[in-house]
Amino acid sequence: GEADAFITGVYTKYSNTIKVAKEVVGIKPGYEHFATMHILNSKKGTFFIGDTLINRHPDTDTLVDVARLMEGAVRVFNHEPVMAMASYSNFGSDTVGSPAEVHEAVRILQEEDPSRLIDGEMQINIALDKELRDRKYPFTRLRGKDVNTLVFPNLSSANMASKLIQYMSPDVEVIGPLQIGLNKPIHFTDFESSVRDILTITAVAAIDAIVSKCKCTENCLI
């Protein structure tokens, strides 16, 4: 087709549109998974959270892909990604289940790029409270840094976090979900999306399409 971007989801199920999108346009080379993220604009700054829509129970490899995709997407919005892999556990305090998978994902990502500003696993308050984090865990490579990117351990926690923030903090501007990782700019809305939400996602999709046409390989949403 001739379209440069596609917005879907208002009158269809997420699961159906996600499956079709993946089958039609495929996943970006170098990745096995795609994801979505939300942008939160607040008085405390701009934050990026994911994966808020796609991967229900991500394993270590999926979390690695999500983190790498979010890292590139955050740069598109002219922010330097300082990333925390979220969990109920802190830096190996629980060694089984989800925390162990998150911990292993952090190890892989740090070995892959020693300059990458990412650490975890850690609880949300540890991630966002720089002074507390530096005092309790002085060994972290995020020492002295303000975290702006949160990779959640599963879809339930990320989705609930974004919904809770929208409900409890109406002054926070929430943008998303923004698809990251497919070969084309396909973005998803739902029946709860307002006109403003749809317009915002459409604007992001337009930027996404422009970046795609410039054949961006790293710092792009798709």
Each language-model region and where it sits:
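Anion-binding alpha/beta catalytic cores of soluble intermediary-metabolism enzymes, centered on
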Residues: 1-144, 148-222
